[in-house]
């Protein structure tokens, strides 16, 4: 399998009625090898269009069905076409998000100007939100009411199967979204 540098992200603009979604792919380390993560990075403007910030560490879902639908369509397509285990996650933040470090616990820490998301923890993907770069807040879904928890779990954790080398190019070229 061809190794792809972590900085070489596959990006495409997907108009879905709610805004623009950028595609990226990366794994724990400098290259994409074997299992990987396909991360939907939502732009900062789309974040404010679809989410309502209550305070520094609590976020309420607003009109998230559109973003969720995009992830679902992608997962359905990839699960049919490919056979390698991976995970699709949704990460909210600005488009200039940078990967800062990968800890020994294999937790991928992603930080941008305002928000911090920690993704990928032993096969389970969580979404964390914080305005403090030095602290990790509680998982988002634990802050919501019971009726919202299942939605957020699916919104943040989406296991599928795909071929790391070709998945993004195929999805975008076929314009399945």
Predicted regions and their residues:
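DNA polymerase processivity clamps
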Residues: 1-177
